[in-house]
Curated annotation (Swiss-Prot):
It is an enzyme of class 1 (oxidoreductase). This is 4-hydroxy-tetrahydrodipicolinate reductase. Belongs to the DapB family. Disulfide bonds: none annotated. It comes from Shewanella baltica (strain OS155 / ATCC BAA-1091).
Length: 270
């Protein structure tokens, strides 16, 4: 699409929300139409641009999407699973597209998202950076070549405030590898080890999680054999990489038919 796409950002007052506002401001083809915070927030009525440090945008923080129905085309949501489901329901009822960067959905919630996406265009991705989405393609290749004879471990680290573990990105890494090898991640995943665990089963995929300080996001997949190992690593140094990906997804999504899409499709990697 060559024209501007109007976006609304929910959770505008959080760390990611403020970064999304800044990314929208800096994008040539995105216009910030609305910024939403929870009811009762002290930020309601504050200029979204001043909140994000980019100057006045004349878009005031509101406490309900109902006040912004005519102000945007695509909703961008990096909040929490329960809230994202509520927001997606609203988007379906008001014929709005939605970009979901939230992680930590349970199986039932994923089924709800699939059903809602039959009625409105949705991009959902655990990680919207270009580098991570390229990494998933590299993981497919590594799994094809080395997966059958190596021990596979996934290590991820995030800041102390992240609430879900392992991260959605780490789980997606495991899913990509397991699918390539014809395995079921739910059956072969091992989440942390403690005590006398016995020898490692080569059919498993191990996960280790770090939560510390202000780590933005670090992910490594290790394919370890006797005498050598391959490590594929992505490190994010700023949330802006995820925010820019979300803007790219919103700009792409506005012309799509109802359906559930991912960043691989947005980036043309499928």
């Amino acid at each position: 699409m060559s024209g501007q796409v109007r976006v609304a950002i929910v959770g505008a007052g959080g760390r990611m929300g403020r970064t999304l506002i800044e990314a929208a401001y800096n994008h040539d083809h995105i216009l910030l139409g609305a910024a939403i915070e929870r009811a009762g927030s002290s930020l309601v009525g504050v200029d979204a641009g001043e909140l994000a440090g980019v100057g006045k945008l004349k878009v005031m923080i509101m406490d309900s999407l109902d006040y912004a129905t005519d102000d945007f085309d695509v909703l961008i949501d990096f909040t929490a699973p329960d809230a994202s489901i509520v927001h997606l329901d609203w988007c379906v009822r008001h014929k709005k597209a939605m970009v979901i960067g939230t992680t930590g959905f349970n199986h039932a919630q994923k089924e709800q998202i699939n059903a809602f996406a039959e009625q409105t265009p949705v991009v959902m991705a655990p990680n919207m950076s270009v580098g991570v989405n390229l990494m998933w393609k590299l993981l497919e290749l590594a799994a094809e070549v080395m997966g059958d004879y190596t021990d596979i471990e996934i290590i991820e680290g995030h800041h102390r405030h992240k609430k879900d573990a392992p991260s959605g990105t780490a789980l997606k890494m495991g899913e990509v590898i397991a699918k390539t090898l014809g395995r079921d991640l739910e059956k072969c995943a091992v989440y942390g080890r403690e005590g006398i665990t016995g020898e490692r089963d080569r059919e498993t995929i191990g996960f280790a999680t770090i939560r510390a300080g202000d780590l933005v996001g670090e992910h490594t997949a290790m394919f370890a054999d006797i005498g050598e190992r391959l490590e594929i690593t992505h490190k994010a140094s700023s949330r802006m990489t995820f925010a820019n990906g979300a803007m790219r997804a919103a700009h792409w999504l506005v012309e799509q038919k109802p359906g559930l899409y991912d960043m691989q499709q947005v980036l043309g990697l499928h």
